[in-house]
Regions:
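Structural motif
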Residues: 27, 54-57, 102, 135-136, ...
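Anion-binding (especially nucleotide phosphate/pyrophosphate-binding) glycine-rich loop
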Residues: 46-50, 75-138
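Single conserved hydrophobic/aromatic residue that forms the stacking wall/gate
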Residues: 202-205, 209
C-alpha cells in the first residue's frame, strides 16, 4: 500500500489519523477486511428480506405514520431514493469543502464497519468522490442532530445517485455531469440504502472535534 493511501476499515479511525488524511491529502481505499464485512452484511440483509414474512421498518415498510404500509420488492430501492430526495433540504450557508471531505471520511469509515447493509459500490463511490475532490454542496442548517443529521447528510449523499450539485474544480456543477465525466454510473440504491447514509451525525461530529 502506498504511503499516500489510507485503508478505510483497517482499524480505529483516531483524531491523529483523521488529521493526517485531511492535512496530507491522502487517498482512501477500502481495506480487504472492510469489503468482506460490507458484503457479508449486504448478503445477510438480502436473505432476511427474501426469507422473512415479518415487516422490516423502513426497509419493507414506509416511514413514520406510514409504517403499516408494505412496500413491494420491486419498490424497495425507490423507497430509499425517495427518502434521500425528500430530506435533501438543508439551507443556510454552504459548508466549507474541508468539512465536506471530513463528513465523507467519517461516512465511509462508519459504513466500512459492515453494520449498515449497504452495497460495496455505494461505499466505493463515496471514496471516488473523496479522492477526486468531487464535493457535494451541503448547507449548514436543517439538522436537529437527534436521529441523525438528516437534511445535510441527504444533501451529501444526493449526488451519488446523480441528483443535486457538487463543487468540482472550483465550480458549481450538476452532479450528473461530473458522474458522466468520470464514467461513473449513478448508484442504484437497494433496500435500506437511504436510511443508512442519513442515520448518523457526521456534520455535528466535526463540531465536537
Amino acid at each position: 500500500m502506498s504511503k499516500n493511501v489510507y485503508q478505510i476499515g483497517s482499524g480505529e479511525l483516531t483524531f491523529e489519523i483523521i488529521e493526517r488524511i485531511i492535512n496530507e491529502n491522502l487517498k482512501l481505499e477500502l481495506a480487504p477486511e472492510a469489503k468482506l464485512r460490507i458484503q457479508k452484511c449486504r448478503d445477510y440483509l438480502d436473505h432476511k428480506i427474501a426469507s422473512s414474512e415479518e415487516p422490516l421498518y423502513g426497509i419493507t415498510t414506509g416511514f413514520g405514520s406510514l409504517c403499516t404500509k408494505n412496500i413491494s420488492s420491486g419498490e424497495l430501492g425507490t423507497l430509499q431514493e425517495n427518502l434521500i430526495k425528500s430530506h435533501a433540504c438543508s439551507v443556510g450557508e454552504e459548508i466549507r469543502p474541508v468539512i465536506i471531505k471530513l463528513m465523507m471520511l467519517l461516512k465511509a469509515h462508519a459504513l466500512s464497519l459492515g453494520h449498515s447493509g449497504v452495497q460495496l459500490i455505494t461505499v466505493q463511490r463515496i471514496l471516488d468522490f473523496f479522492n477526486n475532490d468531487v464535493l457535494p454542496i451541503v448547507y449548514d442548517r436543517g439538522s436537529l442532530g437527534a436521529s441523525g443529521d438528516l437534511a445535510p447528510l441527504a444533501n451529501l449523499f444526493l449526488p451519488l445517485i446523480g441528483v443535486g450539485d457538487v463543487n468540482y474544480k472550483g465550480k458549481k456543477c450538476e452532479a450528473i455531469s461530473v458522474l458522466d465525466e468520470f464514467g461513473w454510473e449513478p448508484v442504484r440504491l437497494m433496500s435500506k440504502e437511504g436510511l443508512a447514509p442519513v442515520s448518523y451525525t457526521h456534520l455535528r461530529a466535526h463540531e465536537t472535534a
